[in-house]
Swiss-Prot record:
Pfam name, any one: MscL
Family affiliation: Belongs to the MscL family.
Keyword Phosphoprotein in record: no
Stored PROSITE patterns: MSCL
Alphabetical list of NCBIfam families matching this protein: mscL, PRK00567.1-4, PRK13952.1
Bilayer-spanning residue ranges: 10-30, 89-109
Protein's recorded name: Large-conductance mechanosensitive channel
Keyword vocabulary terms for this entry: Cell inner membrane, Cell membrane, Ion channel, Ion transport, Membrane, Transmembrane, Transmembrane helix, Transport
Length: 143
């Protein structure tokens, strides 16, 4: 069997196609979750914490070079200049994204599992000794 034919058989299997569709939808869905967190949740958290902007929360690990022309309070400006900084605000935002995404996926899986009907178990085959005993019983009844 040629390698191309094997690959074709592999690629058209149901699980591979389902996985591809899932990855594409997941990528699009993560953008929605990013927007929800960045544009809806984080501003509310910022208001509740007194106008705190998490995207600019960082700890400076290095020194700012004298040639730096950006805003020393801007994490993005410091990153662009190559200054070492620990951006914990960005991490908090990503962690919230993850928790929301994981919770939504959990709810989706739970809903799908609820929709699935449990497969009815096939009746167990009657053991051979029971069949033999039934034959003996039936033959005794006929006498």
């Amino acid at each position: 069997m040629s390698i191309i034919k094997e690959f074709k058989e592999f690629a058209v299997k149901g699980n591979v196609m389902d996985l591809a569709v899932g990855v594409i939808i997941g990528g699009a869905f993560s953008k929605i979750v990013d927007s929800v967190v960045k544009d809806l949740i984080m501003p509310v958290i910022g208001v509740l914490t007194g106008g705190l902007d998490f995207s600019n929360k960082f700890i400076l690990l290095g020194t700012i070079p004298p040639s730096f022309k950006g805003n020393p309070d801007s994490f993005k400006d410091l990153q662009a200049a190559g200054v070492a900084a620990f951006g914990y605000g960005s991490f908090i935002t990503v962690a919230i994204n993850f928790v929301i995404l994981a919770f939504i996926i959990f709810l989706m899986v739970k809903f799908i599992n609820k929709l699935r009907k449990p497969a009815e178990a096939a009746p167990a085959a009657t053991p051979e000794d029971v069949l033999l005993l039934r034959e003996i019983r039936d033959s005794l009844k006929q006498r």
